Amino acid sequence: MRIDVLADNLGFTEGPVWLPDRRIALTSISHGCLYVVDPAGGPVERIVTGGGPNGLALGPDGVLYVAQNGGIFGASGSAPAGVQIVVDGHVDYFATGMGAPNDLVFGPDARLWVTDTRAEIDYAAPEASPPGWVWACPLDGAEPERILEDGPVFINGLAFTGDARSLLVTATLSSALLAYEVASADSPTWARPRLVHTFDNGWPDGMVISPSGQAWVALTAADRIDVIDPAGDRCATIELPAGSLPTNVCIGGAHSDELYVTAAHTQSLLRVRFSDGDASMTECALPG
C-alpha cells in the first residue's frame, strides 16, 4: 500500500468526489470553497461557495451538489444553509430551508439524500443538541421531503447499501454505523435503525460503498479507514499518517482501484494505492 499527498494547504477538507475527467473535487469548510485537484499535477481549481461547504456529490446530470452547512463550524463566513449546485464554475442554490446539511448522496430512487446535523454540536452536553434529520430531494424542483426527523445527534455520513435496501448513516458521537430500511417517510422502520457496527477508538464521518458492498468509513480521531462488510464485521483497517484527521473518502482512479481521502488536520488530499499482496486487505475485496 502506498499513500501520497496530492495537494495540501487546502484548509479543512471534506467531501472528495472522483470526476469523469479524472480529477477530484473536494470541499474546504474553512476556505468556503471547492477545490478541484488533478492527480497528474495540473493546476488546482478553486470555486467559491461561501459559508461552510461540507459534503459533495456528482449528479447524473454532471452537476456538483454541495451540502452547505451555513458556516456553523470552522467556516470563514456564513451563508444560507441548504444544497448548492455548481455548474460550469457558477454556484447557485438547489434547495434551502434546512438546518445544517452535512453530507449527501444520490439514492436508488434518483433523489438526492441529505443528512442534516441542524446545529453546531455541544460536545460537553450533547443531549442538548437537536436530533439529526435526513432529507430526500427530487431533481425536478419539487419540495424536499424530510424522511427522518428523530435521527442520532451529530448525524454525519451516508450511503446506500449495495442492494439498495438500506440507508447507512454514521452517528459520530456514539461511534456507530446505523442502517435504516428504505421505505416511505411514515414507515415505522425509520424510527428503529439497525446497529451495523460500533467503531473502536474513533469517530465515524464520511463513507463510500465499494462495488463488493463494503462500507469504507473515515474515522477522524483515529487517523484510519475501517472497512465494514455487509454483515457488520470489520474486515480491514487502513492506517493513515498520524494527525491526518480523515473526514471522508471516495473511490477513483482509471480502474476504480484507488482511494482518495480528505485529511482535514493536514489540510490535504491523500491518495491510497493498493497491491494484491497487501496484508491488511487479505480479507477484503479491493475497491476495484
Q: Residue ranges of each PLM-predicted region?
A:
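Loop/turn-rich, solvent-exposed surfaces of beta-rich toroidal or solenoidal domains
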Residues: S175-A176, Y180-S184, P193, H197-D233
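A short beta-strand motif characteristic of beta-propeller blades
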Residues: R2-A7, G42-V48, H90-T96, E143-E149, ...
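A short helix->beta-strand "capping" segment at the edge of beta-propeller domains
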Residues: M1-G11, P39, A191-P193, T282-G288
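Short loop/turn segments immediately following beta-strands, especially the blade-tip
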Residues: Y180-P188, R273-M281
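A short loop-to-beta-strand structural motif that recurs across blades of beta-propeller domains
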Residues: C33-Y35, A81-Q84, G132-W135, A176-L178, ...
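Beta-rich, blade/repeat-based domains predominating
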Residues: A7-R23, G50-A75, P80, G97-L112, ...
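Short loop/turn segments immediately following the C-termini of beta-strands
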Residues: I29, N69-G71, T117-A119, T172, ...
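Flexible "stalk/tail and boundary" regions
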Residues: P20, V36-E45, P60-D61, Q84-D92, ...
